[in-house]
Amino acid sequence: MKKHIITILVFTTGLNLFSQSNIENQIFDIGIESIDSFREFLSIKNDANFKNEMKPLIEWGINNFKKYGFEVERLETPELPLLLASKVISEDLNTLLIYLQFDGQPVDNSKWDQENPYKAVLKERINDEYKITDWGKLDNLTFDDIKKDDLRIFARSASDAKGPVMMILNALEIMKRNNIELEYNLKVIMDFEEEISSPNLADAVKKYSSKLKSDALLIFDGPKHPSNLPTLTFGARGISDITLITYGPI
């Protein structure tokens, strides 16, 4: 069952302008403010096996990156498009490309201890079990309170991988409120078919290579370190498989 600890990642560029405590307070406040938006995001179906249901998710991606001054274009493929959001500060600056995944694993309602996997619920840990609690419990809490009660949001893709999308948007919101300017160009590629092995991604990268051209790539996905600290992983393994054919009685 997917769960998302209420925590927000913020870009570090320009944070030296503010005290650490001020930034931490803003991260928490904006994280709480964004809960309703996150719940709305989680309510949008994102199973790439049902392509006719993915349009609202694609529109959500377009609208939410446009709010932060990005130019967003569809990179068409034979099936679902990719989205490319670009914010070019200067052609003389380096460019960072961020990869985000929007789709999620198929849903088996029978395995979820809640009304609907696409209807997010807040749970707290009681005697080693997570029990549904009221969203109002988040009112007037500190981050230490949330950690103490082990409050978590349960919904399909709350962690894998709508959580990282919301983290990026909240980071952009903090930068906007504090008038922090990017010191590099930023591009974001949004994949709506990752959980079905991104069948069109490789060809799209070749076809749109000039649009995707960047100096560095950050894949905003994957598990955190067991310490629960923010993690940067330098390099990623690929995947391989074998087909084993047996003959005779088993």
For the regions a language model picked out, list residue spans one by one.
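Sec/Tat signal peptide C-region and signal peptidase I cleavage site
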Residues: 15-19
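Solvent-exposed residues in well-ordered beta-strands and their adjoining turns
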Residues: 12, 88, 245-249
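Short beta-strand segments
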Residues: 99-101, 218-221, 245
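Acidic/histidine-rich catalytic neighborhood of metal-dependent amide-processing enzymes
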Residues: 147-235
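Acidic/His- and Gly-rich active-site-bordering loop/insert found
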Residues: 21-154, 165, 177-182
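Flexible glycine/proline-rich, aromatic-decorated loop/lid segments
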Residues: 233-247
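Sec-dependent N-terminal signal peptides
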Residues: 4-13
